[in-house]
Amino acid sequence: RDSRIAPTRLLAAAAAAAEDGPRTFISASAVGFYGFDRGDTKLTEDSSRGDGFLADVVGDWEAATAPATDAGLRVATVRTGIVQAAAGGTLRLLRPLFSAGLGGRVASGKQWLSWIGLDDLLDIYYRALYDDRLSGPVNAVGPEPVRNSEYTSELARVLHRPAVLPVPSLGPRLVL
């Protein structure tokens, strides 16, 4: 919690106090803002904050940009989904499990998963920095979410491995 909120607040205050300093403040954020599971509701940047620990942390994280906003800087908070990259992101964690034949859906598999490729995420940060039209929350996700069961089936297909062992719903909550 504090590893995200305190540094963001300090950086926002420093940017706000700098004479001839930046006119833009970009902060990382997360789609965890929307909560763990909102069912089939389509979520946009205008959607309300969800419930739960992660939603509370992300809400406080975004609120930590207030010094920059109050000083008149253009502030964008990039709400990032699950990052996909060949050598990192979520795949770095999941590939060994799936390669060992231990991969599978989480709980029912019906949860929506909003993801983004690393190159697209970098492009969003670049645009947030230089495009004056971007301010406030910016969802850094692909155009359509997928169900967890679809994601795990596709990952298993690409890796030529089975996806038969479901992960209990408690597993991801312990990690987060």
In which residue ranges do the predicted regions lie?
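NAD(P)-cofactor binding segment of oxidoreductase domains
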Residues: 1-25
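Catalytic helix-loop patch of NAD(P)-dependent Rossmann-fold dehydrogenases
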Residues: 2, 38-77
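Conserved catalytic-site region of short-chain dehydrogenase/reductase
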Residues: 27-42, 49, 83-88
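Glycine-rich "substrate-gating" loop/helix at the edge of Rossmann-like oxidoreductase active sites
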Residues: 49-54, 81-87, 108-118
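Glycine/proline-rich active-site loop of Rossmann-fold NAD(P)-dependent oxidoreductases
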Residues: 59, 71, 84-93, 128-138
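Alpha-helical substrate-binding/gating segment
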Residues: 66, 95-103, 111-145
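Mid/C-terminal beta-alpha module of Rossmann-like enzyme folds, strongest
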Residues: 124-175
